[in-house]
């Protein structure tokens, strides 16, 4: 069955970042997994895609073609929906463990598959078999050239409704920043030194970022083989209580992002130390991705695609290269301030705040644009590939809705996403949904032990929560959460 759409003769240029992310050296895709509480009937799929998904954005009905001078453009085409829908068949009547393994193997396989060049860059995979986490799963595979996580999450949410009242829009946790008010409430004598410090930090951060991307690789370690290339991966998930994370946030007066990053940093170092004691001294860097929009919540797609939109559609992200603090017992090179687990959160807070307050992230964007104009998108893609390859870990997070939601009247039990196609051995993505934080870990299947790594992340969460809360009753609560999380670590 074809989706009847008029093919436009006008081709729209692909954004610069879209060209970087779909090149001969770098081709990134996003897997978004929606877990259903009830078994899935795929009979509504065609109508949902035709009437709801395709109209969201013309890019979902376009292919990427190369024009004059190698400039890529979006060209509208007729969409054959059956070419984009995949419903795999597994053996019937098997155990949940059997379907867990089959689902994980299938997820690993499609994460490596490339999109055909002659059709729009998206797919949907419907898994109608139960797993330990859900009665069924719907997987959206979307090429990163279509948009970043913010854009694509907004697109998916356009297909979803509130479970309690579909007429009311989904709501999201507020994200407020006082950075803009900082100098308004501070005397000019205190503000000038801060501006001077930011200038110095900008020069240092930009120079260090350039060196890390071009010349300086992280040490080889239990989380970085240094081999590059594309190998089979495995994707596992963990679930944490958002309320517990908020308790840590309130105690330390930091952001939820700082808490998440601190937990990941500590858990990663614990894994490295347990795997190889000498690796505690390894120099390791995390590539922390963040959105450059002034996010206050997701906008409707109609608002995002307007000219000069406040929060426009597309790829509007940049990265921070943040050194992962070392454990205090890792030798002379250790960061002595990290002996307390809370120091990992505070270290993440100070490093990220310092780097975000410098203009280095914007200079990096300007440099990439200049590189594209002078040497073309392929050269820019090689620079980004080198940035990923020289780092040990990628971290990205998104805000999800506060209320339970449904997809075509199917209650969504949980959701998570991963970014695939990069040369790094380890990538961690986080999304919130109904007072839960879902952490997805994509790792090299032959190099990193998934159970051990997840156990170390869980241990880091427990250590930081206990240290932050301090009193007896919350500590008991922490133990309960930790035990629950141990049951929720699944190979998804």
Region locations from a protein language model:
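Generic start-of-chain signal for non-secretory N-termini
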Residues: 1-29
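Soluble acyl-CoA-dependent acyltransferase catalytic core bearing the H(X)4D motif
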Residues: 2-10, 31-55, 62-424, 429-436, ...
């Amino acid at each position: 069955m074809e989706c009847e759409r008029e093919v436009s003769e006008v081709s729209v240029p692909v954004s610069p970042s879209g060209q970087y992310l779909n090149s001969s050296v770098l081709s990134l895709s996003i897997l978004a997994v929606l877990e259903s509480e009830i078994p899935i009937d795929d009979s509504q799929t065609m109508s949902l895609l035709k009437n709801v998904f395709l109209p969201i954005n013309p890019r979902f009905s376009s292919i990427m073609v190369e024009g004059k001078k190698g400039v890529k453009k979006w060209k509208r085409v007729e969409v054959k929906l059956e070419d984009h829908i995949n419903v795999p068949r597994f053996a019937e009547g098997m155990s949940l463990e059997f379907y867990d393994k089959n689902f994980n193997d299938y997820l690993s396989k499609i994460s490596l598959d490339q999109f055909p060049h002659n059709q729009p860059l998206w797919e949907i995979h419907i898994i109608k078999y139960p797993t330990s986490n859900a009665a069924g799963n719907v997987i959206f595979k979307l090429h990163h050239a279509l948009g970043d996580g913010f854009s694509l999450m907004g697109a998916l949410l356009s297909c979803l409704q509130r479970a309690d009242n579909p007429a009311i829009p989904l709501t999201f946790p507020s994200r407020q920043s006082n950075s803009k008010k900082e100098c308004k409430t501070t005397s000019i004598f205190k503000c000038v030194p801060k501006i001077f410090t930011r200038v110095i930090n900008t020069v240092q951060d930009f120079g260090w970022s350039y060196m890390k991307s071009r010349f300086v690789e992280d040490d080889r370690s239990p989380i970085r083989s240094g081999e590059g290339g594309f190998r089979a991966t495995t994707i596992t998930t963990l679930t944490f209580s958002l309320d517990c994370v908020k308790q840590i946030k309130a105690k330390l007066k930091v952001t939820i992002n700082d808490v998440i990053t601190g937990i990941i940093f500590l858990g990663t170092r614990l894994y490295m130390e347990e795997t190889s004691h000498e690796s505690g001294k390894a120099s390791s860097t995390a590539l922390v991705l963040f959105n450059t929009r002034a996010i206050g919540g997701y906008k409707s797609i109609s608002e995002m695609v307007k000219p000069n939109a406040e929060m426009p559609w597309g790829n509007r992200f940049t990265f921070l290269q943040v050194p992962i603090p070392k454990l205090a017992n890792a030798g002379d090179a250790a960061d002595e301030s990290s002996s307390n687990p809370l120091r990992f959160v505070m270290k993440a807070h100070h490093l990220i705040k310092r780097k975000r307050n410098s203009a280095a992230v914007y200079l990096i964007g300007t440099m990439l644009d200049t590189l594209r104009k002078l040497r073309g998108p392929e050269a820019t893609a090689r620079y980004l590939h080198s940035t990923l390859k020289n780092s040990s870990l990628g971290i990205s997070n998104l805000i999800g809705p506060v209320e339970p939601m449904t997809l075509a009247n199917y209650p969504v039990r949980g959701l998570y996403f991963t970014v695939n196609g990069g040369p790094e051995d380890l990538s961690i993505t986080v999304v919130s949904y109904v007072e839960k934080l879902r952490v997805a870990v994509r790792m090299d299947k032959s190099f990193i032990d998934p159970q051990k790594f997840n156990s170390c992340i869980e241990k880091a969460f427990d250590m930081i929560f206990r240290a932050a809360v301090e009193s007896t009753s919350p500590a008991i609560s922490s133990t309960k959460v930790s035990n629950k999380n141990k049951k929720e670590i699944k190979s998804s």
